[in-house]
Amino acid sequence: GSLAAWLGGGRNRFALITGLGYAFTGEATGLRKLLRALIQQLYRFSLSRNRLVFFQNPDDEALFRQLNLLKPAIPSRVVNGSGVDVAEYALSPLPETPSFLLIARLLGDKGVREYAQAAALVKQRFPDVTFRLVGWIDDNPDAISQAELDAWIAAGSIEFMGKLSDVRAAIANCSVYVLPSYREGTPRTVLEAMAMGRAVITTDAPGCRETVVDGRNGYLVPVQDVSALSESMIKLIENPEQVAAMGARSRQMAEEKYDVHKVNKAMLKEMGL
C-alpha cells in the first residue's frame, strides 16, 4: 500500500502494521530465514516514504526500531488494534455448560496444537466440557495437516466447525475464548469475544498480552505452555462465577478501549484528518 501510494504520487502516506506473521515467528532458519530477510528489506524501502506509521502493539514498534526497519526520523504511534463494533458484537448470555472456543487459521503459530493438547488433558477430568475450533487449513508452511486435525476430531478432543463467515453464533455458544498464539498485531477474534462478554485465555505474547489483564478479564499463559493453558481452563471450569465476572470486564474493556469508532477517531486525529 505504501509503495502504491508513493508510485501514485501521494504526498501524505501512512502505514498500519497489523501483525508480522510467519516470517517473524519461530527460529529464523531455512525458508523462514529467507522470507524474513526479504520482508525486512521491503519494509525498510516502503516505510521510508511514509509520514507516520501505526502499530497495533508496542512490541512490534520496538522491533521495527531495533531492526532499523523504520528510520528514526519517521514518527510512529501505537493504536488499539483495528477495533471492534461493540453494537454488532453485542453482549450475549453465557451458555449453561462450560465450553471453549478458538477461531484461527489452522497454523502452528496460532497455538492450535497447544489448544488441542490442552483440550485432551482437560477432558480427562471433565469429559463433558466442549472444545470447539473454527478455521480452515492454510497453504502456509506452518499449517496444521489434515491428518492432525482428523486425529483430534477422532479422539474427541475437538469439535471442528470449519470456516464460518459469521462467528457470532460460535462465540455466543462458548463460555471462554482461547487464543494461544505465538504473536499477533492485535487479535481481532479476541476483541470480538470480549465485546460479546467472554473471558479470554491468551498468551503473554506481543499483541495478545495487551487484551487481557491477568486475573481480571481472563488469564495470560506462556507461549507453547500446554500445562499452564490447561490449568487456566480448569480454573474457569471450576469457578463459573469468575467466568461471568471476567466476561463483564471484557465487555467493559471492549467498550472503553477497543470500540472501533474510538480507534478510528484516534487514528484520524494523528493523521490530521
Regions found by a protein language model. Give the residues of each.
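Nucleotide-sugar donor phosphate/pyrophosphate-binding loop at the beta->alpha transition
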Residues: R11-N12, Y22-S46, A62
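Donor nucleotide-sugar binding/catalytic pocket of nucleotide-sugar-dependent glycosyltransferases
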Residues: Q40-A90, L102
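Conserved donor-binding/catalytic core segment of Leloir-type glycosyltransferases
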Residues: S82, P93-K110, Y115-A120, F131-V134
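Glycosyltransferase donor-sugar binding loop
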Residues: I103, T130-I144, F160
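Aromatic "clamp/platform" in nucleotide-sugar-dependent glycosyltransferases that forms part
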Residues: K163, Y182
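Short hydrophobic beta-strand element within catalytic cores of glycosyltransferases
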Residues: A199-T202, V212
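Conserved acidic donor-binding segment of nucleotide-sugar-dependent glycosyltransferases
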Residues: D214-G215, Y219-V226, K235-P240
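A short, well-ordered alpha-helix in the C-terminal region of glycosyltransferases
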Residues: A228, K235, Q242-K257, V263-A266
